[in-house]
């Protein structure tokens, strides 16, 4: 679709400007520019080749900022807190066992930090089809990393996540003793032997994890720490992103023909709505019943099947044509 629109823009420009004498004479100038807007902040090198065409190359990057996410650690995959007669949840009981065995205290909440990772090289061609040579159409592309955002747990929650991984390892060892014949070698158990009553309680409780959302079949997705005891996610789009837009270029000061401003508006075609993956490869955007904050962020990102570009730039012409 973007290729067809590009062809239409160029054809219209050529047909409109072909009658103007000297329109296509090659007589370039060079300018440098700074810009800011929805693509971040950046710089450009510009060359007005003739009355009709201008070429721009540059780099934009999004300044650092953070947005929070919070998850509750649960035990088991049925969504039931499992309160006992004393009002303690399943998590409270298992966290107590873990503290008794290891001395580590586990918090039920894990905070994650989301931050942009959006930077792109750009190559753009402006076409000035009108007589006043201020309004223009633009085609070109942006290119950068496919990962445009990352999320990871706060450093303060590393101990909690280490405890979650430790508990799940204990669960696996207990499970092996009860149900996995391969855990026995020459009559010796390779798992972890605890008092039978403790084994029963751990197995009845289930594994620890953070409920992020549900798969389409209704199964709950429980995110667990990776091998480094961290939880992470990445937001991805296409690395190559065609661009179509329009803009206006004018003088800042009529007495100084070297200093210009420009407004650009258009769309970056980045391959549909961004996709979000956790460290274990699960695509969050395909889940339903997402956690509150995650649901809000995913709903927002799903609306952006293309990325809107709205930028302001100021340029200085190094030498005139």
Locations of the language-model features?
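Short loop/turn motifs that connect adjacent beta-strands in outer-membrane beta-barrel proteins
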Residues: 21-29, 52, 130-135, 251-261, ...
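Transmembrane beta-barrel domains of outer membrane proteins
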Residues: 35, 44-46, 126-128, 247-249, ...
